[in-house]
């Protein structure tokens, strides 16, 4: 079983920790794009890591995934509908929550036995490789707060 995701998740978690520790309150409120602030993007990461945490717990308990738990092809409606809830959380608390949930999911997926991880496929609602999603959005945040020359 390829467990390289553990190191990749760890790298992106360390990157997120470092970023969150140096972000000012002003930077947390900076816009990353038309819809999301820096804190909002961190909340978005926390939301999807939280979903993964739910599914990893279910896998750990050896409970089967159901068809209704499959992620839809287009998740824009989920992201758009979660944004007001994410934005209602204080920016600093949201940033700290993102780190905390990332720590929890990384620890849980790293602890899952190989035979459980091997049961996952492309249709599984759990992707133990949290690094890809995190890294994509951390890149966006870093670009948004980078001083313009």
Predicted features and spans:
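Amphipathic, well-ordered alpha-helical segments in soluble domains
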Residues: 12-19, 48, 101-104, 108, ...
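Short, contiguous alpha-helical
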Residues: 31-76, 114-149
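A short secondary-structure junction motif
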Residues: 16-19, 23, 59, 108, ...
């Amino acid at each position: 079983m390829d467990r390289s995701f553990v190191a990749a998740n760890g790298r992106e978690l360390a990157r997120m920790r470092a970023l969150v520790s140096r972000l000012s309150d002003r930077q947390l409120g900076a816009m990353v794009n038309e819809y999301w602030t820096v804190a909002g993007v961190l909340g978005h990461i926390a939301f999807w890591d939280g979903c993964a945490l739910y599914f990893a717990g279910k896998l750990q308990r050896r409970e089967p995934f159901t068809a209704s738990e499959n992620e839809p092809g287009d998740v824009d409606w989920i992201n758009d509908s979660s944004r007001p809830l994410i934005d209602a959380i204080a920016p600093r608390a949201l940033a700290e929550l993102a780190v905390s949930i990332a720590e929890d999911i990384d620890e849980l997926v790293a602890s899952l036995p190989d035979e459980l991880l091997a049961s996952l496929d492309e249709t599984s609602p759990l992707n133990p490789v949290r690094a890809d999603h995190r890294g994509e959005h951390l890149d966006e945040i870093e670009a948004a707060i980078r001083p313009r020359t």
